[in-house]
Every structure is written in C-alpha cells, then in structure tokens.
C-alpha cells in the first residue's frame, strides 16, 4: 500500500490579513488586540481537521523589499501601511504556530508566494498531494493535477478550490496563463501596471487567441482594434515586465526541504496556555479543555430549582442572588421571561406573570433593606421600571465587579464571568437560547434551571470578586462609584429623551433638497448624469473624463475613498462638492433616519443604552442611538441636536460641560508648575502653551501658534506621536517632533510624568486612575517597537482619560443626590463626553445655573480648579 503524503502550504501574511479584516477589532483582558490571531487560529484548526496533512508549512514575507523591486521600484507601491493593530498580532501568530508545531519560514528578498511555489513543485516531484491556502488569487498559477489552491472568499473559512479544471471553467485559461493575464491587465493590489486600458475580459480574449504575452506581442498586427494595437505597441515592455512581476518563483534558494516539514500534532499544553492568555474561550471549548475541567467540577451536579406559583415572604430573604431574565440586546423592548432567586432557603424560579402581579414580590424588590446580588443592575433597573417596579437594595453587581477587575474582558453573561473564575455551574445564554434569528425561549423546565444556575453562580462569585476588589484597593471604586452610577444610568435610560419628530423629518427633507442640489451641481460639472454613489462610475468621471491624477487603484477600478478625495480637493471644484455630498448623505441616512428608527412612536422618545462595562478607560459610551457620535463639525450635524427637546411644556434643556478637564487632570497628576499656574490664574491654556513653546509674549501669539499649541496640548492627553501631530497640523514629521520636544522642554512636569508613568507601568503591568481604576498593558514588554510605542502612549494617557471619566461619573452621582435633596423636578437625561444634559422647568433653570457648576466643580479635589460652562435653551442645540 502506498504511503499517504500530503503537504499543506499556507500564505501566512495573506491569511492573517484576511482574518484581521474579517473579524471585529477584539482585545483580551490585558488590552492586546486578538482578532487576527483568533481568526488565524480558527482557520488553522479547520485546516488540520479537514486536510489532515502529513507535512505542513506556513510561509511569511520577510520584509517590504524583494528582488521584484529591482525590476520595478514601484512594485506594491500603492499598498496601505499595515495597521499597527495587525502588526502587533503577528508575533502571537508565530507563537501559535510554534505551539501547534507547524513549520514556518521566511526568506529575505523573497515573498511567501515564492517559498510556496518552490516547495509545491519540489513536493510534486516527490509524489505528494499539495494543498495551498491563501487569500491571493496570484497563487492559482500553481494549480496542477497534484496541487490544489484554496483561496479564501467571504469571511475566513469560506474557500474556493482551484484545480486546473476550475481555473479553465472560471477564466477560460490554463493556470500557466494566469501570469499572462496579469501581464496584460496588471494588478492594482500589487501595483503591477499591465497595459493601460486592458481589463480582465480583454486580456482573456487575447490569450484565448494568442496563448501568451510573448506570442501576442509577436503578432500585434493580427489584433483587431486600432486603439488596442497602439496600446500594446506602446506598452510592450511594460506587459513583459508585468508578467515577470506576477510570476511566482519555483526555484527560490530556500533552506528547508519537504521531508523536514512533517506534522506530528500540536503541543496541547502550549496551545491551551496561549488560548487562555488571549481569552479564546470558544476555541478552548473546541479543544475540549473546558469540558474536561467541567467533568471534574462537582458543582455541576443537578440543583433543585423550585417553580413558585404563589410568592410568599418566607423565600424572599436578604441577601439573595436575584436574576431578572430577558433575551436580546435591547432590554428596553425585550419582554421579561421570568425571575430567579437563590438564598439560604433554596433556589427558586418565579414566572413573570406571577411575579409582577404579586404585591409581596414588588414590596421585596422595592425594599432597600432587602439586599440583592445581581448581574448588570442597570439592565435590571430598566426592565423592572417598564413593569412599574423600582429596583432597590441592589448591593452587588457581578458584571461591574468583574469589569473593574478585568477591564479588558468582554462579559456577555453570567457564564462568561463564572468561567473566568473556574466555575462551571451555568451554561452560556447563547447555548440555551440560540443566536440571532435562531434565538428562542426554551421550555419552562430548561428556563427555570438555567435561571436558577445563574443566580447560584452570582451567589458563588460574590465572595471571590469582593476579595479581589479589596486586594486591588478597588472596593471603594466599585461601591461608591460604579454601583450607584448603574442605578442613575438605569433611571436616565428609562426616562429617555424627547425627540421633535416633525423637526427631524423637516431636517431630513432639507438635507434631501441639499443632496439634490449637490447632485445637480456635480452632474453639471461632470457634463453628464451618473450615479455619484457608485465608486466605479465616479472613478471613470474623475480619472478618465476629468483627468485627475490617480492616487490609488483597487481591484475593480479607481479608489474614490475619502482620504483619496481629500488629497485631490485642490485639484478640481467637483471634488469638494462630492465630499460635501457624501457628508450630507451620511447625516441623512445614519443620523436623521437612524434616529427616527429608534424613536418610540407612542412617546416620541429615544431610550439609549449606556455601556458602563465596556471601555478600558472607564468612559461611558451609548448605543441605539449612539449619542456620543452625533457629528458637530458640520453646522448641519450640530443642528441635529435641535431635535432633542424637553419632554414637558414650559421646560428647557440645560447643559453643563467641563472645560478642558483632561488638561486639568494632567496638571494635577503631573504637578507641572506651568500648567498649574495657568489653570489657577484662569489663563487661556493654549495661549500660555504657545508663549512657552515659541518663547513669545502674550500679544505676539498668532492664531496659527495657538492652533499648534492646542493640537499638542490635546495630543499629549491622547499620547500623540510626531506622526499623528504632523497629520493634524499638516506639517512634516520632523517639525512635529521638534514641536513636541519644545513642549516637553517647557513643561518639565509633564515630561517627568510621561517617563514615570511608563516606568511604573512596566514594573506593575498596569496603570491606575485617581480613583484606582486599573488598565493592564502587557504590550509594554513587547520586542516589537510599534507595539511597545503604542503601549507606552497608553500608559501615559489612560490615567488622564480614566480619571476624567471617573470625575464626571462622581459628578453624576452627586447631582442625582442634590436634585433629590432639594426636591427639584429637573432630571438628568444624558452624559456625552464631558457634558451633562438635563431637562428642567423654566423656573428651576436659575437654581441649576448655581447648583450644577458648584457640584461638578467639586466632584473631586484637584490641585487646579475644575471649570464648568453651562447654558440652557429650548433644545440641546440651543443649550450652548
């Protein structure tokens, strides 16, 4: 019997790139981006399972320069720089391959394709079946009766297999002719020029007639079409060069042999360690790791959950783990499925109808003395409020505790926290209810046990989480900030914000009319009607008809992305109109129509969802609608705020905004004398910075100087690099670097803070805010310069951003208490960035003008005064 020999060759860069863009930007609890590694691991696991290779190698590109650059200097010149979020994941991909005991190889001056081509041909001679995996169709030229090329399509696991027959079926060509096709049509992704004006269809037609580029060029006279003949004659050398560039080498000087690529299985222990470190719980389950642990976990024994038909006070004791169950993300709309309670008397499931109709149950939920332990108290507050019940006595929130301890983790349900702490007593919501459109409510037996297990997990986790919070000096952050804030956010969400639907619709009509105007103007300049939203049609108009210089090409034609158009804005009037057209179109579709979709028809209110346990800095964000994201650079964008109005007659919107809070926090943390002096004396900080950096008197500071100073002031807060500042100011990187150096020379305290924060973070592994919030930054020890630089900037800016976020949260808690204490009707509606938005009766506005700044400015004592600007008006737009 012939021994089975199968070699799998993988284009590592291509699949890593594909995985990165196919998945959302994920990160683990330490803040390390992981989406490319996760996707690559999924591809790898599927590959090993499906292909069962006897031999395997993953090839990588060794660098940016290859022997092909000697032929054509601009080879791959149009490619965008690899995103740093992907670059930082490449070492983990290599580490993963080592754990899987899969050979990897790269060769200076050669591409991964050349390594693959050389090994494929060598393996064919040795009688191997060969499978090549890539996202690059160039490799289809390697397809033979012994080599199949698998090209990824959508996502990361959907592949198309190219055999010689499939190549013929798809292109009408042989695999050997793929390089001829590239020679004629070029390849924008690799910046291979080809012959201008020759696309895929023309190239295929010519090759069917002439077989190869060389034979075609020998027989140009036989080509039909005068223009095509002229192009082929003019670009003859370019066609031959393009074919050469597209040709994969099959005799590269590699130092590995096929026989040395034997695959004998992976190192289970190492793979599990990597998956755990990166937070790949789903992949751990696929390895069987969790199930193995679960079998040893005695707590998985059946629990006795009693279904309650009549709520009595003897089961409602304090403290109790309490579950308010819904499925789906939008808890403002999802119905409650039921409740569960676990305490010293037992485990209970209470069907929704029985619970909400029970006065005993309602009294217990609304009794502040009856302590409840929950998961996501804000969600529970909102869900119960829609039933006319106020949740009180929520003493412990598993979600918030876990978030404070592990801010980089994403906790979707109780099971995800339980797993992190080695508890296997509850299944994930997804495994019980299903996902997406397949989500469904199970039988009452299944539901009652699932809810009972959830409550049991909450009860079991509490002690562990409290202990860890105490050890981290974070119990006060949890008890005094995040827990009370959750209840306030819940009230804000359920109160909602009134939307003037008629005004919003009028805005939509106005924007529609403006869009029409721009469309007509663009068509007039172009000299013909065309679909402005079609990149292909727009590209033809801009680059062929008008003749603008081509900045970048895509596989389907010319790139007309925003960054490309901005580079061309000064070249022709039409470009500015197109940019305006797109901005107006986005305002209309994303914001006007988007807001109308989420506005409740009965109350004309939107009920956003604040994400309290999401960001690593502690900042709040919001969803459905994302109120943080309403554009304010364009006047049309700012005007959208006109649609947010008071919910009652003779009321106004009142907005209060921290002035330069992050710079004030920086002054406090860094103890920089210059910054402290400026803020203490209420100086214009940007003018002061310009004076110090440019060494000029106050009256000599120009608007350009102040603008540069402002950019560097805020840039420092966000850990800006010389590159980032150069982009913001439109200056060279060298000039930006010199500006930053002069800034740090003038602000020695800031310089010392930046250096000290990085050193401290390297020693501890994390940075902290003024209220002891932590952010873990393991990338500080990375050997990769880009990863390490990003981590250092994170170490510098997180204490500033995080402390500012904590201050505004504290202000919200203090304000809620003051409104209640003074028995005011005013309501806190929104928190957006550094701004608090209220609605209040007109007669209370004068009170708020004194009360709100006083409370906000004293939320936390700093070495410099906090300053609050405020205004009121009939809409959010007018409160400026």
Curated annotation (Swiss-Prot):
Its EC number is 2.7.7.7. It is an enzyme of class 2 (transferase). It catalyses: DNA(n) + a 2'-deoxyribonucleoside 5'-triphosphate = DNA(n+1) + diphosphate. Keywords: DNA damage, DNA repair, DNA replication, DNA-binding, DNA-directed DNA polymerase, Exonuclease, Hydrolase, Nuclease, Nucleotidyltransferase, Transferase. Residues 174-268 form the 5'-3' exonuclease domain. Single-chain monomer with multiple functions. In addition to polymerase activity, this DNA polymerase exhibits 3'-5' and 5'-3' exonuclease activity. Belongs to the DNA polymerase type-A family. This is DNA polymerase I. The gene is polA.
């Amino acid at each position: 019997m012939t021994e089975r020999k199968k070699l799998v060759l993988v284009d590592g860069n291509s699949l890593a790139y594909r995985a990165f863009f196919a998945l959302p930007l994920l990160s683990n609890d330490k803040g390390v981006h992981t989406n490319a590694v996760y996707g690559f691991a999924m591809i790898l696991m599927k590959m090993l399972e499906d292909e069962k290779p006897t031999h395997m190698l993953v090839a990588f590109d060794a660098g940016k320069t290859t022997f092909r650059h000697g032929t054509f200097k601009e080879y791959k010149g149009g490619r965008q720089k690899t995103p740093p979020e992907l670059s930082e994941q490449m070492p983990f991909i290599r580490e993963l391959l080592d754990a899987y005991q899969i050979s990897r190889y790269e060769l200076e001056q050669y591409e991964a394709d050349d390594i693959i081509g050389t090994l494929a041909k060598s393996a064919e001679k040795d009688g191997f079946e060969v499978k090549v995996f890539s996202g690059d169709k160039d490799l289809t030229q390697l397809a033979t009766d012994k080599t199949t090329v698998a090209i990824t399509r959508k996502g990361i696991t959907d592949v198309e297999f190219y055999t010689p027959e499939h190549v013929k079926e798809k292109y009408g060509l042989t695999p050997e002719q793929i390089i001829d096709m590239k020679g004629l049509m070029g390849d924008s992704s690799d910046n291979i020029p080809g012959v201008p004006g020759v696309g895929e269809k023309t190239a295929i037609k010519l090759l069917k007639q002439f077989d190869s580029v060389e034979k075609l060029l020998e027989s140009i006279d036989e080509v039909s079409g005068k223009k095509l003949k002229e192009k082929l004659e003019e670009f003859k050398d370019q066609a031959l060069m393009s074919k050469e560039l597209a040709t994969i080498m099959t005799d590269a000087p590699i130092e590995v042999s096929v026989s040395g690529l034997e695959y004998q299985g992976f190192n289970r222990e190492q793979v599990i360690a990597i998956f755990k470190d990166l937070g790949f719980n789903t992949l751990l389950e696929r390895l069987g790791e969790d199930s193995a642990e679960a079998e040893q976990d005695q707590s998985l024994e059946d629990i006795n959950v009693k279904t309650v038909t009549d709520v009595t006070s003897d089961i409602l004791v304090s403290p109790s783990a309490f579950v308010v169950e819904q499925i789906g993300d939008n808890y403002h709309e999802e119905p409650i499925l039921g409740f569960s309670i676990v305490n010293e008397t037992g485990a209970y499931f209470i069907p929704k109808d029985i619970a909400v109709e029970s006065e005993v149950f309602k009294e217990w939920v609304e009794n502040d003395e009856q302590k409840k332990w929950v998961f996501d108290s804000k969600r529970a507050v909102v869900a119960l409020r829609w039933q006319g019940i106020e949740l009180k006595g929520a003493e412990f929130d598993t979600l918030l505790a876990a978030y404070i301890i592990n801010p980089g983790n994403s906790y979707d349900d109780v099971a995800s926290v339980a797993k992190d702490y080695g508890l296997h007593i509850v299944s994930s919501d997804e495994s019980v209810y299903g996902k997406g459109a397949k989500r469904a409510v199970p039988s009452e037996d299944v539901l009652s046990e699932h809810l009972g297990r959830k409550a049991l997990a909450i009860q079991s986790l509490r002690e562990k989480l409290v202990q860890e919070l105490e050890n981290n000096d974070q119990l006060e952050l949890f008890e005094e900030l995040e827990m009370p804030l959750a209840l306030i956010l819940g009230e804000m969400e359920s109160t909602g914000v009134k939307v003037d639907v008629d005004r919003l619709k009028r805005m939509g009509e106005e924007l529609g009319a403006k869009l029409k105007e721009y469309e007509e103007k663009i068509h007039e300049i172009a000299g013909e009607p065309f679909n402005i939203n079609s990149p292909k049609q727009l590209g033809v108009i801009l680059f062929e008809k008008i003749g603008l210089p081509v900045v970048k090409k895509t596989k389907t034609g010319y790139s007309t992305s925003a960054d490309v158009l901005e580079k061309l804005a000064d070249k022709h009037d039409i470009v500015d109109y197109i940019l305006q057209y797109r901005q107006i179109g986005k305002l209309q579709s994303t914001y006007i129509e988007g807001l109308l979709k989420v506005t409740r028809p009965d109350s004309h209110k939107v009920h956003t969802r604040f994400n309290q346990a999401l960001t690593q800095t502690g900042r709040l964000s919001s969803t459905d609608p994302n109120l943080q994201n309403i554009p304010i650079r364009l006047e049309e964008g700012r005007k959208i705020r006109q649609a947010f109005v008071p919910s009652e007659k003779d009321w106004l919107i009142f907005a209060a905004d921290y002035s330069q809070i992050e710079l004030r926090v920086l002054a406090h943390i860094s103890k920089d004398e210059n910054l402290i002096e400026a803020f203490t004396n209420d100086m214009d900080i940007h003018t002061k910075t310009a004076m110090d950096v440019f060494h000029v008197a106050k009256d000599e500071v120009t608007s350009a100087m102040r603008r540069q100073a402002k950019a560097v002031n805020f840039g420092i807060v966000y850990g800006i690099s010389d590159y980032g500042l150069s982009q913001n100011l439109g200056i060279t990187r060298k000039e930006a670097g010199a500006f930053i150096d002069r800034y740090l020379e003038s602000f020695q305290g800031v310089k010392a803070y930046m250096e000290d924060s990085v050193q401290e973070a390297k020693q501890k592994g994390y940075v902290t805010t003024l209220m002891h919030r932590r952010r873990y930054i393991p990338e500080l020890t990375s050997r990769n310069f880009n990863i390490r630089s990003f981590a250092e900037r994170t170490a510098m800016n997180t204490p500033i951003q995080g402390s500012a976020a904590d201050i505004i949260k504290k202000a919200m808690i203090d304000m809620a208490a003051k409104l209640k204490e003074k028995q005011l009707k005013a309501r806190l509606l929104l928190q957006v960035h550094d701004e608090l938005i209220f609605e209040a009766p007109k007669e209370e506005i004068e009170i708020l003008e004194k009360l709100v700044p006083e409370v906000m400015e004293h939320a936390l004592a700093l070495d410099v005064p906090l300053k609050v600007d405020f205004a009121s008006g009939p809409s959010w737009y007018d409160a400026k």
